[in-house]
Amino acid sequence: MNRTAFLTLTLLLLGVISYAQDKIPAMADVPAGHFWMGSSGWGYDYDEAPVHKVNITNGFRMSISEITNAQYEEFRPEHRQLRGKDGFSYGDDEAVVHVSYDDACAYCEWLSETTGRHFRLPTEAEWEYACRAGTYTLYWIGDGLPESMQKHQRTERDMVPVSLQTCSSPANGFGLHDMHGNVEEWCIDWYGPYNAEEQTDPAGPSEGIYRVTRGGSHNTPHEFLRTANRSAAMPSDRHSQIGFRVVESNYRPDYTGQVAAAPGNVRMKKAKWASTGDKPVWTAPVPYIHTPDDGTPFYKHNHQPAVTWCDNGDLLAIWFSCDAESGREMVVLSSRLSKGSRQWSKPSLFFKVPDRNLTGSSLLHLPDGRLMHMNGVSNAGDWKNLAMSVRFSEDNGRTWCAPEFAAAEHTVRHQVIAGPIITQDGRIIQCCDAGPGSHDGSAVHISSDWGRSWIDPWDGSGQPDFKEGGNGSTIAGIHVGLVELSDGSLMTLGRGNSIVGKDGRKQMPKSISTDGGKTWTYSASGFPAIDGGQRLVLMKLQEGPLMLVSFTDHPQRTPENERGMDFTHGKGYGMFVALSYDDGMTWPVRRLMTDGVERMLDGGAWTKQFIMDSTHAEPRGYLAGTQTPDGMIHILSSRLHYQFNLAWITEVPSGL
């Protein structure tokens, strides 16, 4: 090789090396050591306990801030199209967002291949060790977060845009910036429980559902930015509050955590159903929500149920539990009524994406015996910006596959409502509130492949004028019930967007679609409007008629002279059931939901205590319903379980 060629090759190699090194983010050294991980785990923070000793035997280098737009776009230039989405992260040096766990791992692999060095995401233990930098205060900087380090630290329905400029906060003792806030950061671990034993280089369980995120974000209350706080997300989630930083280390983490055990005591034998026949059957309401005694997270507000039946004869009920409906402490709990039992089980944890609001749940029994669960998943708190998740069970709800997104964008039209249906041609139709307000209307999401993919047939137009004879692409009312009529058209009844009827009073709106949910025509339903703390059930019974369960009025908001409805033996108040034999044109059968026995009941949630007697039924509650193969109809309110059959509805009540 001549001198010129040698020099040329040398310069080329130096250029390649220089190019590769330029890709490496600014890094800080984090030495080996040990620390005490977690917190006392009081209240919402139960998953931070127990405090346990962790040894970090391998020092590592960590990027001094989150990976920026400019750095990430060296790997994926097309990501530039997402700059500024939702009002965040416009600049080169702002933290990259709208990246999934897999996106973050792919960047680490690319950076490793490009530089010939070893990059990955931090383990959860490495992240907390690096954040603490030898401290044990709530934040590395102390027990409070200075104003200069805050980026609108509160929950907002409409997030307030802030800069995500990296290195905008002081560095901790290891030289790391932005460890509290800016954006959450993906960690390599599956989310799982802590244990009290001393651990060395832990890396979480070998399998799981959610990946850990740490550090908190903008538009997030202070407590979620604490050093010990644990959050997590579905690995495929992407939104404006999660980014990542990288670690350089030759150490490859090995799984060390616990894998959650599947619940037991669920029978697998298929039940035999005997018809209840023509004899009226009514069972006095019993609670399906009890206080757990095994440490299951349980809060003061238990609400918004869904229910279905299982092939083994059990009923499965779910609902959310929280202190605030906009809260990030929200969990979805379940209880089970085993076939032949009158006592519902104590609640157990059914669904929880840590530190995410989970408003909106539904359950559905599929023809092949599987169960389908759909749920809203917020990017943070509140119930406006929800994605929709879906998962399935093949063993009567004992275990469930990992959830996937039915609709991945965190936006409106995704607040799942109980009561999905299966149409005559095999489509699943799931109703959702179209917005967070009481008069935002409703949407439908449709699957033609048994839940694997979903579409919203909405044309993108604004909210229509919900008036008699009007039409639009959004359903009138929220919390709607949906049925398919005999000609294949769809009908809903809902709450809010009331339409004045011929009697001059506000009535529950009815919406009809003859084109598979693309457009809807509105009219007054003939039934009283309902309001806060109330949700109806609309079902097509196995025997053929349509069934509505709703309320005669709102006990606080309906004008007194408009309260109550006329029934066979006079005026009644509260929950009632009605039947239609002509696709909702007329409703000749109406019965107050009571057996006439006076009793004091606790309806939970917004209902609280009420008297049931011959003229009064439950005054309000969020209803959900299912009909089992034996013909029994099961209605859940916010706390109580009612069961009866068609013969009871049509029976002429005596003494009422």
What label would you give each PLM region?
Residues 1-4:
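Positively charged n-region of N-terminal signal peptides that target proteins for export
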Residues 8-15:
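Bacterial N-terminal signal peptides
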Residues 17-19:
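Sec/Tat signal peptide C-region and signal peptidase I cleavage site
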Residues 22-83, 102, 181:
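A short glycine-rich, aromatic-capped structural motif
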Residues 29-30, 36, 40-44, 81-95, ...:
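Functional-site microenvironments in short loops/helix caps that host divalent-cation chemistry
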Residues 201-205, 231-238, 565-567, 613-614, ...:
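Short proline/glycine-enriched turn/loop segments at secondary-structure junctions
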Residues 240-253:
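Short, structured beta-strand segments at or near domain termini in extracellular proteins/domains
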Residues 255-656:
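Asp-box/BNR beta-propeller blade signature and adjacent active/binding-site loops
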